[in-house]
Amino acid sequence: MDPELLPRVLLPEEEEQQDRRSYRHSFYGLLLTLLALGLCSLTGVALQSGWSPGSLRLVDEILTESKPLWQARLLSSWQAGVEGSAVEGPAAAAAEAGLATEAEPAKSAAAAAVVEADHAAVASEDPRCSEIGKKILKSGGNAVDAGIATVLCMGVVNPMASGIGGGAFILIRAPNGSAEFIDCRETAPAAAHQDMFEGHEEDIRNGGLSVGVPGEIAGLYLAWQRHSRLTWRDLVTPAADMAESGFHVAAYLANSIATYNATILSDPGLSAVFAPGGKLLKKGDTCYRPALAAILKAIAEKGPDVFYRGERARALVKEIQAMGGILTEQDLESFQAQVREVLLGKAFGLDFLMAPPPSSGGAVILQVLKILQGYELPLASAGVLGLHRVVESLKHAFALRMHLGDPAFVNMTDVIQDMLSDEFAARLRSSIHDNITFPPEHYGHPEDESEEDKKRHPHRHQLYAQLDDHGTSHTCVVDQDRMAVSITSTVNGPWGAGRMAVQSGIVLNNEMADFSLPDRPGRIPMPFEPPPAPANFIRAGKRPLSSMAPAIVLQDGQLKAVVGGAGGTVIISAVLQVILHFFCQGYSPFKAIDAPRIHHQFIVQDLDGPATAALKDLDGPAGAALQKLDGRASAGQKRDSAAAVPSRGPGRKLIGAQEAAKLATTEPNFPPPLFGRLTAVSDPRKDGGPAGY
């Protein structure tokens, strides 16, 4: 039967009020996020490039309200399998930053986003940083060397997303097939506790109290100690030189400066660098970061002890405490990066090397893939029915996600076993109905679960509020020996804590915002709002749950892809869909990254993004298409009209321009022998640019 003709079951009229609330969980509500289309940027290394000039202007047209044209193109894109791409529209902040408001020609954008290489390749969010990584590779360095140098560069040119004031996840696969995961995520200071923000919850996102103990330098140094070929100085010096000599402000940084101008102008450290003389830097201006250059040079010569101990550490702590923070010298000195076992999984005939907790990304992606592999292709992910199945699978996985946390503090054995189990995935798949969706309590457990199973696995029936993290940068590297590295680094929110340590030029993280806070006494939750997750409550020395999801994909023991992303919770859905696009739908590498994506994280409270206004007036062909998609709405729920889009409600979030993912793949049977050719892809919507040779 045509899935679009499947019947909808109507609830009794007297249940209309409940029905309207259930509407918030409907697939229709989610699919409106398709209007975000290409706003989520991606980069990577792939087999071949491709581009679709007809859809590159789509979001630009949405934002300029060319409704008849964009509606027709949107409907056409859906019917064609949505293989196009989209660029960011002329937002006011972008215009103020001096950004172009017209889309670049599709062919030149695609050409800048793709590099084919026989030996080694780097995909990052800035072509200058990718070039640094390439130079490291050509000078005899391996993928770890190139990854370290590239990530440090990203912290210089994209400080709103990452830097040495934050943390990172590093996934490494050696040429001999061994793999490891280095966790250098920020930790809560020793004086931290779960009630530390009670009465002033706003401080969890801004200021000194939101700062966790930075871990990036410790993690990069540990990776260097375990895997490097070159000297530490060789890897740190390029970023130090760039910070000292200055660099041109790219469009992405200019946009962020304009968007967060109040944050920058209100902080002496940030304003001195990014608004000298009170004038915000714009695209093409030269930015100088001498204080950061000085500490990077010291780190290059003397190693991470310069950062974590001694005079510079004391100065950093003093500044953070002056901002209201509780971080101490002992917190810095005691930080340790952790080597963890890689999370392993199989789906669609592929082997996945994923990030383990405190990342939630690896487990969620693996569970969704295991659910979807039980469907026949392409309806596991393509078309209206495929999208519905992806969404329902995401809802099941996100329902279990908030039981995860720092393994040093949380016993997650049963949860991880569920999320990696083929049998459990099959039972969840059987609870997905192709014509309806359900209220939240339906998800996270099989539909046919017995009372005995409910008692044995209570986590399946306890729903918790979702962590909604932000920001980050990602880098993928594959070298000539096919060592693969996938690194996600972050200061969490845009511009982290909104503070810069003046003496060191370090943008400070606000990683404490990634913890869950207990409910305030007397607070009345919103409808369908679950309680916060105890597994992610603040504890001294604890790492908060993360959405970062660096991944490496193998087929028959051979490296096939290196994938990762940036952008908070949308990392999970973005990386998932890049994998589905490339391996299951046969997209070219460029299209796999550039194609529109949807996002669902089970329960969220806000609908954000530059295309929000466009969602409120949805008529014509696109509206009709959404009505068909809405045929899988909650049993009996009623739809006011295709134009009725609440600005708040569970289960929807527009994908923003900050997101990025990377794909690195090898093509078998192509010279050099045994390894295959590399194609690096970086999404031009985030100023990304790959490099290789």
Task: Indicate residue ranges for each PLM-predicted region.
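Noncatalytic scaffold domains of N-terminal-nucleophile
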Residues: D2, E15-S26, S41-G89, G98-K135, ...
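Active-site rim segments in enzyme catalytic domains, especially the processed small/beta chain
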Residues: V156-E180, L327-T328, A484-Q555, Q585, ...
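Extended C-terminal subregions enriched in glycine
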Residues: P518, P525, K542-R543, V575-L576, ...
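Hydrophobic membrane-insertion alpha-helices, especially the h-region
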Residues: L30-G44
